[in-house]
Amino acid sequence: MAVISMKQLLEAGVHFGHQTRRWNPKMAKYIFTERNGIHVIDLQQTVKYADQAYDFMRDAAANDAVVLFVGTKKQAADAVAEEAVRSGQYFINHRWLGGTLTNWGTIQKRIARLKEIKRMEEDGTFEVLPKKEVALLNKQRARLEKFLGGIEDMPRIPDVMYVVDPHKEQIAVKEAKKLGIPVVAMVDTNTDPDDIDVIIPANDDAIRAVKLITAKLADAIIEGRQGEDAVAVEAEFAALETQADSIEEIVEVVEGDNA
């Protein structure tokens, strides 16, 4: 059984590609047709490649892989952060800083500075510093958190990188390739698929499409780490949360189901 159904893909608008004049000819084999000047992605292939991506991510996670989620455009930022956190992984959802992977030592120093500023606030150092200095430190922390907060606790260079829109994230993809890090990516009709190790032909501009694919890959990581049952349990709780706004109401729903 496919991890994502054709119906889910259609409802999320995964099939809508870019304008035909903006296409990359290397994506021709993943295109079903053209309609009103827009390429339509072949969802039968998306189903197949999504299955392959799921298996790849699940197996990597089962071997304790560190996964970095990357998506810096507004349509991807929220989903990338939410699903990385949900699956216990790491993310970059604002501008990619050149050298994030290839100059990891320097990035680690910036992360150490971020942690130092946080400690200063927690241990009371801020209380004895001049207000002007505290304001500057807070400004520095905010900037560091914006760009590095999602990888603050990443223990090492990632073993796998998941990318939403590799056309936009070309620098990130190049750094990953240079270091031999496999890249899993949503690939739209305007993108060169050759640099991607595990592709998912998909509309990477629609929020619902990005959320659907990204959430499914997060599920793969959870399954790889905790087993298939963990994904089912999490889905059950997610369904409960749509019915209840408080812990008390969730308990009532659960007890009602068991009555």
UniProtKB/Swiss-Prot annotation:
One cellular component term from this protein's GO annotations in UniProt: cytosolic small ribosomal subunit
Domain of life, per lineage: Bacteria
InterPro entries for the chain: Ribosomal_uS2, Ribosomal_uS2_bac/mit/plastid, Ribosomal_uS2_CS, Ribosomal_uS2_flav_dom_sf
GO biological process, one term: translation
GO MF terms held by the record: structural constituent of ribosome
This protein's UniProt keywords: Ribonucleoprotein, Ribosomal protein
A Pfam family it matches: Ribosomal_S2
Matching PANTHER family: 30S RIBOSOMAL PROTEIN S2 PROKARYOTIC AND ORGANELLAR (PTHR12534), SMALL RIBOSOMAL SUBUNIT PROTEIN US2M (PTHR12534:SF0)
Family to which this protein belongs: Belongs to the universal ribosomal protein uS2 family.
Name assigned to this protein: Small ribosomal subunit protein uS2
